[in-house]
Amino acid sequence: MSLEENKAILRKAIEAINKKDLSLLDDLVAPNYFDHIAKQGQELIKQLIVMLYKGFPDYHATIEDIIAEGDKVWARVTYTGTHTGEYLGFAPTGKKISYKSVTIKRVVDGKMVEGWTVNDMLDFFRQNRTYRTHRKSKEPLSSSLAYVSQRASRKES
């Protein structure tokens, strides 16, 4: 596939998230997709997105920059939303937030097969002022994906 076609795959995935239509991801993300941060695959990513929708019903992603080289696509993304539902053990604050993310996806045969994403969660927590004042859960929170991984593994047991 061309570099532009690879970039289009990531753009379509972001559009699917913005439209809240995760079924569209099935055509864009390989069933054996592996996320290097979460150490799990496609279903965990969908669970994380659903959690975001619950915490931030107006959640929206905007691609600021997108670059492709070989089979990899890099994107700098800005996420916005209003915290009106529980998220990661934090009670709703009603605050509007905006945070940045950098994601790298490897694309093979028109599908994302591998991913790395770094979110600026410190900025997220600072804006929302949630870390010390609103967190219900007593579990340590090292990152949003680690938290989701913990919850997913508990459901399986």
Predicted regions and their residues:
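C-terminal and inter-domain tail/linker signature
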Residues: 1-157
